[in-house]
Amino acid sequence: MTQTTHHTPDTARQADPFPVKGMDAVVFAVGNAKQAAHYYSTAFGMKLVAYSGPENGSRETASYVLESGSARFVFTSVIKPSTDWGTFLAQHVAEHGDGVVDLAIEVPDARAAHAYAVEHGARSLAEPHEVKDEHGTVVLAAIATYGETRHTLVERTGYDGPYLPGYVAAKPMVAPPAQRVFQAVDHCVGNVELGRMNEWVGFYNKVMGFTNMKEFVGDDIATEYSALMSKVVADGTLKVKFPINEPAIAKKKSQIDEYLEFYGGAGVQHIALNTNDIVATVRAMRAAGVEFLDTPDSYYDTLGEWAGETRVPVDVLRELKILVDRDEDGYLLQIFTKPVQDRPTVFFEMIERHGSMGFGKGNFKALFEAIEREQEKRGNL
């Protein structure tokens, strides 16, 4: 097992060849955007803030923009394809099911970011261009990454609209929760084919100047039956973190193999969301119908011995099936949903950090065994 951590010095940050401001949006291509928006409003406590559709001139697609803190999700479905983009989205849903089509990144200079990326080997999907409305101007560009996923580069300096030109402000679908369920996107995890993890890690190293933050291989990321490998790349400020997983050869089909089969190739596996109160988050999401992975009671029998004291009592962690991990910098609390659609593909992680910038290394075995139990129920192990 190897785990490496790299802390980028301030001088390197100042010379960052691909500066980022953070995640701009996670964009989903879905079969029914209205129903998806309602689900994430009720089950995830998100707030509908913007809309684009036939009522305001978009004849081809309907899109709903939801926010929670700094996290922004966009759900888009095709009404009737009339351009290459609409045809692509329709085919994306047909092949992959509901899934992430775009991990949009906010940058201070979209033209410079696009030029640097293309110069260093990225495939351009959209040249830098301006879009305008009464709220100001946004510069957009896009590059390809693994599978059919893209990174739209968004420069929105001075823009004060609800999302982007072409969108109008929208009223929430449901009454917002008394307490925000989550505050930000923590990281976005991609699954790629066997033998391609290092290729895509190298892509982010070259194209965006991201550094390797952590690496997980060996026994700590394997069970009796299945295994995988993972490396994490991040920008110099750690605002954007992308773990990349690939399957490893083992006795049975791993969770990565299952994803690749049912998604139809590489793509975004899960999105981790920061919360400052994971207990309230899990209680609210469970009450709204979200299903989480189960953890055996035996996990909690010795938890206090190796994880130490946390702000949440062990009996509450046991009740809610929340996992704990601790490293030299602190600890984290985390829990994973089951897939949020019928295909066993995209799911979510809720994470509460107390110093630790890790990814739950100590929980990998318990997590993977929980996923294997679900795979076995589906007949996919």
From Swiss-Prot:
Highest taxon of the lineage: Bacteria
Catalyses which reaction(s): 3-(4-hydroxyphenyl)pyruvate + O2 = homogentisate + CO2
Domain VOC: 22-156, 184-338
Gene name in the database record: hpd
GO molecular function, one term: metal ion binding
Entry keyword Transmembrane: no
Keyword Ribonucleoprotein appears in the UniProt entry: no
Record-linked CDD domains: HPPD_C_like, HPPD_N_like
Record's protein name: 4-hydroxyphenylpyruvate dioxygenase
Subunit organization: Homodimer.
Annotated residues for binding of Fe cation: H187, H270, E349
InterPro entries per record: 4OHPhenylPyrv_dOase, 4OHPhenylPyrv_dOase_C, 4OHPhenylPyrv_dOase_N, Glyas_Bleomycin-R_OHBP_Dase, Glyas_Fos-R_dOase_dom, VOC
Entry keyword set: Dioxygenase, Iron, Metal-binding, Oxidoreductase, Phenylalanine catabolism, Repeat, Tyrosine catabolism
Top-level enzyme category: oxidoreductase
Gene Ontology biological process terms from the UniProt entry: L-phenylalanine catabolic process; tyrosine catabolic process
Names of required cofactors: Fe cation
Cofactor detail note: Binds 1 Fe cation per subunit.
Enzyme Commission number(s) of this protein: 1.13.11.27
NCBIfam families named in the record: 4HPPD
Family named by the database record: Belongs to the 4HPPD family.
PROSITE patterns to which the protein is assigned, alphabetical: VOC
Pathway(s) served: Amino-acid degradation; L-phenylalanine degradation; acetoacetate and fumarate from L-phenylalanine: step 3/6
